[in-house]
């Protein structure tokens, strides 16, 4: 099946937060990142080159489209497309605040650069931190640049957007 213009338009629309939020999805690109996320998030659809698909015959994704490198480059948000891209469903962000008392967590206030947030998530993953609490003004975790910069850490570190003063006040009750 060829990649339709509507699907390309949809993928490219996921660069905008309002579109990601409306459909509760996010975009991931590249063999390592997509490979890491496949085991952690539900995949809506996957687009890949025949080379990548032949190396990953075990896929359980229902909606898979085989494309040429040229077709992939039309859909990709990257300057240099990397064999595969996938659209995943965003997980539920609810959390029991008592998790803070049982584990090391981070709180981030007003981080604006997607690459910086992705790097923080990647480092948190390396140190075994499972939860990051972000102020509402922090950049969207599902921004394609953030997802790319996490290098898969987004699969293991959960981000929660909340009012940090309210979160800190609620900790006094724990």
Predicted segments with their positions:
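Boundary-proximal intrinsically disordered activation/regulatory segments immediately upstream
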Residues: 1-54, 138-139
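Short active-site oxyanion
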Residues: 22-25, 42-45, 62-63, 130-132, ...
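Structural motif
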Residues: 27, 47, 85-87, 106-107, ...
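Short loop/edge segments at beta-strand edges and connector loops
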Residues: 28, 48, 66-69, 136, ...
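A residue-level signal for conserved active-site and pocket-lining positions in enzyme catalytic cores
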Residues: 30, 86, 147
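Phosphate- and divalent-cation-binding pockets in alpha/beta enzyme and binding domains
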Residues: 36-37, 55, 74, 116, ...
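Glycine/small-residue-rich loop that forms an oxyanion/phosphate-binding "nest" at active or ligand-binding sites
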Residues: 56, 62-92
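RNA substrate-binding interface of SAM-dependent RNA methyltransferases
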Residues: 97-174
């Amino acid at each position: 099946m060829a990649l339709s213009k509507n699907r390309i338009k949809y993928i490219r629309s996921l660069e905008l937060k309002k579109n990601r939020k409306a459909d509760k999805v996010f975009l991931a690109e590249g063999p390592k990142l997509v490979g890491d996320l496949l085991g952690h998030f539900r995949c809506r659809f996957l687009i890949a080159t025949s080379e990548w698909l032949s190396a990953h015959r075990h896929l359980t994704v229902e909606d898979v489209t085989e494309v040429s490198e040229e077709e992939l480059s039309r859909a990709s948000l990257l300057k240099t497309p990397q064999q595969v891209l996938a659209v995943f469903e965003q997980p539920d962000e609810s959390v029991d605040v008592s998790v803070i008392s049982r584990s090391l967590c981070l709180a981030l206030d007003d981080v604006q650069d997607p690459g910086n947030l992705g790097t923080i998530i990647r480092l948190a993953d390396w140190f075994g931190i499972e939860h990051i609490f972000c102020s509402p003004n922090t950049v969207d975790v599902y921004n394609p640049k953030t997802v790319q910069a996490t290098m898969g850490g987004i699969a293991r570190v959960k981000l929660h957007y909340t009012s940090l003063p309210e979160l800190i006040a609620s900790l006094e009750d724990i």
